[in-house]
Amino acid sequence: KYESERILSKGVDRFYKLFNERQLLAHAELLSVIRELSEGLDDEYHEPLTVYTMIVFDKMINYNTILSWWHPGRGSLAGIFSRMHAYAWSWDHGEMNVLAEDGGWNWAAPSVLEAYEELVRLLRGVGCSPEVVLGDARDLSVLLEGEPDAIVVDPPYYDNVQYSELSDFFYVWLKRSPLSGLFPDVFLSELTPKDGEVVANRVRQEDPEREYRGMLREFLEECRGVLGEDGRLTVMFTHRSMEAWDSLVRALRDAGFRVNSAWPVHTEAIHSLHQKDKAAVRYTLVLACETRVGGPEGWWSEVRREVRDRVLEARERARRLGLPPVDELVVAFGAALGVYSGYEVVLDDESGGEVDPVRVLDEARRVLADAVVEEFDVGGLDERGAFYLLYRYYYGYPSRSGSPDWEEVRRLCLALGLDPEGLEGEGLLVRYRGRAYLATFEDREVVDPSASSVDGLHAALRAMKEGLEAVERVVEERPDLRLLARGLVSAGYERYGDVEGFPRELSNVVRLLGVLGEEVPDGQRRLDEWTG
């Protein structure tokens, strides 16, 4: 198994070993009481009350296992899947008193009841009753009656989460509960079914990418088959890897869908640990798709111009809506993919080979980079300076653990004609646990001011400790550092609003411009107003 390897390597070869003896005893006794109470319920309440009671039980055991841990910042327990969607080992686990007034059952039950009441409120006034159907998503024509108006799906994201293996943690308890009698067909197997799960799994599958793409396409083709000509498909997507993008967009296009637009939705609280510690996922991307019948064959030279126009339109739309800079990327990607997915196939003019979605996204990055450089009137910057400005514009000044995904930044480098590994060797880019951290002047002890505008800027910021003459010597050697500094301040206004909200490094850039005799504007004035 894939996720199971994490705990098998620690000697946990049975699910009961995920609990200590005290936890096992408490859970088993509670389950016995639930079973007894369930048997005494009237027929009308037997099923619903048993179902919701077991949801409470599941919530409780999630926080009472040897993989639960104490979160010192919150002063409370964190559940088994709080760090990430995985069996994350904790050497020093925490546990709760399941019968305490403010913990265990008395904590889990009210939270489940609150969620139930919210669902009831949201469904109030709906003219039909929701129906829950268990089945293979690739058999929608069998599961559904009639033609749906829309399908909204949050599919598995490539290899991001191994749902079936994680579900086994709860399944083994539910199978031993009254639910196995209420829903016998659901609990026939010893563990959850693994075959046919639409994920990329390097352990179970010989060719994970091919199998994932094939199964995803089967599902999307089934969606296309049950939707009418005016039907809509909405796909939620959070994976940032290029393989996942490529698989999803190809599958959508091949199944007969066109991406109409893409919007970022920030769906999780900032304290959500598996999001906070995994900077690759900061929002859910909602892809709005419409059905299409066939499509023309396109040549990249023509499609590329269309991509450029749509990306610039999308960026302007995002700015009018007040979306932050990083969300401009997402909206622009949606526009670019909309162009691409409208064609049956896009071919390279020289080789005649098929152009893949990744190349389209790279073109979108290149168009956005040119637009930002033009907007801030820093066209004379070298490539490193342009990259530094764009990184700060889109991602700000994050910590190492909060930095963007390495692959995402690598593609931005390539779009500007830079070698990301070369920047890494220079110490400007730091690869940290799959993320790309952009070094500040304080991180870099020795720089050659003449190497680039970024090196010049960092050298000048360091030289401020020595006085004006030292700064002027650096500026004389690399005069375009002024241009980069102005661009960074202008981007700072776009991102942070005013100088008071600037991060430390950017505040130092403002000080540097002051030392050089430049008056930095207040508020959010544009660069052309500043320099005009």
Regions found by a protein language model. Name each.
Residues 45, 49, 222-229, 233, ...:
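Conserved, well-ordered alpha-helix/loop/beta-strand core segments that scaffold catalytic motifs
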Residues 244-254:
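Conserved helicase motor "Helicase C" RecA-like lobe of SF1/SF2 P-loop NTPases
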Residues 213-229, 254:
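A short glycine-rich, Lys/Arg-flanked "PGG" loop and its adjoining helix->strand segment in the class I
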Residues 202-212:
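The substrate-binding groove and active-site-proximal loops of carbohydrate-active enzymes
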Residues 59, 234-241:
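Conserved short loop/turn motifs at secondary-structure junctions
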Residues 27, 146-166, 223-226, 238, ...:
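Conserved proline-anchored active-site loop of SAM-dependent methyltransferases
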Residues 1-147, 163-204, 219, 243-244, ...:
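Nucleic-acid modification enzymes, centered on SAM-dependent nucleic-acid methyltransferases
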